[in-house]
């Protein structure tokens, strides 16, 4: 998977997941699944249910218009109802 990170000030762009069967209708970072990755150096590796997710993080400057999107303030992370997947990604981004 390619995970696209859009950051403005101290906020991250999240979208409502309507694309993937996992974490359906929950807030995640914009992602794209790669069918046959070549030379893929992952940043993160998650195990979710019966799925192994290798994730490459891609930082983007220009924020596109995404349907059902909002900006998450990292300082108020605990006040949002988010899947642990999204929280782990934010934690990784803050540490690296």
Short names for language-model regions:
Residues 1-96:
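Intrinsically disordered, low-complexity, charged terminal extensions of DNA damage-control enzymes
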């Amino acid at each position: 998977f390619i995970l696209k990170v859009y950051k403005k000030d101290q906020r991250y762009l999240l979208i409502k997941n309507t694309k993937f069967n996992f974490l359906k209708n929950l807030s995640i970072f914009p992602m794209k699944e790669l069918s046959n990755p070549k030379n893929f150096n992952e940043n993160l590796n998650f195990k979710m249910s019966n799925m192994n997710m290798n994730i490459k993080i891609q930082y983007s400057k220009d924020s596109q218009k995404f349907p059902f999107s909002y900006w998450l303030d990292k300082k108020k992370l605990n006040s949002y109802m988010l899947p642990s997947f999204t929280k782990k990604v934010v934690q990784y981004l803050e540490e690296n």
